[in-house]
């Protein structure tokens, strides 16, 4: 039997397969990241731009526009158990401790830019507080089980100083390895950590998966990449033309050679001739002045119109309003409703993505609950755990208030409903505080009413004691209808 410091044969086979798969996918992932970060340098075709000017780089941030506006709309709110209207306290504590919203934002950014993101749920120093972290797809390779829609094995490789570390996660065990970075050296097994989970505690967030490509696809599509390349080359042509043709060219006809000679007999430079000599040319011996012709300077709109054409194509591909690309200042919406209509398709995409990512986040919550309760089953109702997202549409407080007020007036919804406060844009913490304030305010109102009743007790006839001066002879007052 092999010692625990040596990889078993089946473990080594899995490790080598995943390591090869990661290396094979790394180039495509790095290219997608370069488009997202605006670091991709477009290849010069060397048709109109000489090789000596290839050092001029033109960069467009349109790749980032395929990612960031969509991540901004994916705002996680809370987990709720089936039948409950409030967030679960246990899961809320775990998520707050781990900064889950920040980790989820990074995983979603990876999913949109690289096609997939990963969230790992592990253990830390506190056995009842799981660790939830986002892992980069460029460091991760996965063997996926299509039937169970879950990973069989997951390998994560990362650098630590001069050495390279690797973590191989398998059902019931986690293997930690290291490599000294020397060519030809072997991977060393540092630790073998058994656990009680019969699954790999890694969740994949795949953007726009297909039945034949479940690993997801980048939101920076091939069509968008072609548009970015064409627009970048056009901008490069604009840069070169600005340097060569922005100064109007001039032609001098009938000038004498002496017009280009300095008083000391040396020749004037081309720059001196352009700036000075042509302004003070003398007549020749026949009294004729040299004829100066100025060529028409280049028009930059030749290039900017092409860039605008590419921008219009990118706008359609991205489902973004044209002004998002910084080209159409006249494209600003005239009203809030107009802005909502312009971004409607992007909002519908966000709704679809929420439906896609909800089962994945439910798996994250299940893993967190299992690790926080070692040896125990999931709580009742956890299988139907709900994931609450904030609405992706642009929020208009005035419009929302008007709509809710009309619904409350029609008694379609109760005014103190938590749903009403959520539609008005209040966060869970704010809604809880408002509920506490409402209870305190109602208590104050009841106390104030009780104090008023104590100070002014009502008699059986409906008047205050000692205050009914018209109660009749028995009350010491005047009878009804009597004169004063």
Predicted regions and their residues:
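Intrinsically disordered or highly flexible coil/loop and linker segments, enriched in small
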Residues: 117, 233, 237-248, 316-327, ...
